[in-house]
Regions:
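Metal-dependent nuclease catalytic regions and adjoining charged, substrate-binding loops involved
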Residues: 101, 105-115, 120-185
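Metal-dependent nuclease catalytic cores that hydrolyze phosphodiester bonds in DNA/RNA
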Residues: 1-88, 94-108, 112
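A short mid-domain helix/strand-loop element embedded in enzyme catalytic domains
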Residues: 91, 95, 141-144
């Protein structure tokens, strides 16, 4: 949903674009991300965070028909200067170039697809939490030197309405969205 090219998302949703066949290197990179996520959750627990719904126990959050997302965890206590819980947890690993762009521009400007993901995870319906989530702790780890970036992402209901409109157009739309770019990269 957060991909800037809605045409690509529209086609992928309908299985009308080539299915990416991930090879060994990419599968290992995915595995690195999963392992680093587990390590970060352990680190957060060790400094006093109450974090749950991690790993294989992630919450399943429905934001629209056929659109589900899963935060990497839910924090119930431990973040300095945060009074309202629960707080979603989202973590990514990045190469140096993407990490430094994130540091300079923040999540929304450097990785809008991750910002959109965080918004969706705060908005959607789930059966486990009894209260709404109003922010997300986004953490990125630089794969080159293990630097950590952290940012609190506040829920943005007006922006979420735009995401939902995109989701409805992708799921229920009958016409192909405009091209984002003719550049294949």
């Amino acid at each position: 949903i957060g991909c800037p090219c809605q045409r690509s998302t529209f086609l992928s949703f309908r299985w009308a674009s080539p299915i990416e066949d991930f090879k060994g290197q990419m599968l290992r990179l995915f595995d690195v991300g999963t392992r680093e996520e587990d390590i970060m959750v352990d680190n957060l627990k060790n400094i006093g965070f109450d974090i749950r719904y991690t790993g294989k126990d992630q919450l399943k959050i429905q934001i629209a028909p056929h659109v589900i997302c899963r935060p990497d965890g839910v924090i119930f206590d431990g973040i300095p200067d945060i009074d309202e819980y629960p707080v979603n947890f989202e973590m990514k690993t990045m190469n140096r170039s993407n990490f430094e762009k994130l540091e300079k521009q923040g999540l929304r400007n450097s990785k809008p697809e991750y910002y959109d993901q965080a918004q969706c995870e705060m908005y959607g319906e789930n059966t486990e939490l009894e209260t709404e989530v109003k922010c997300t702790l986004f953490v990125a780890l630089c794969k080159d030197d293990s630097r950590i970036y952290a940012e609190i992402i506040d829920a943005n209901p007006d922006y979420m309405e735009l995401i939902l409109k995109r989701a409805r157009n992708i799921v229920f739309g009958n016409s192909l969205p405009e091209e984002y770019s003719i550049d294949p990269e």
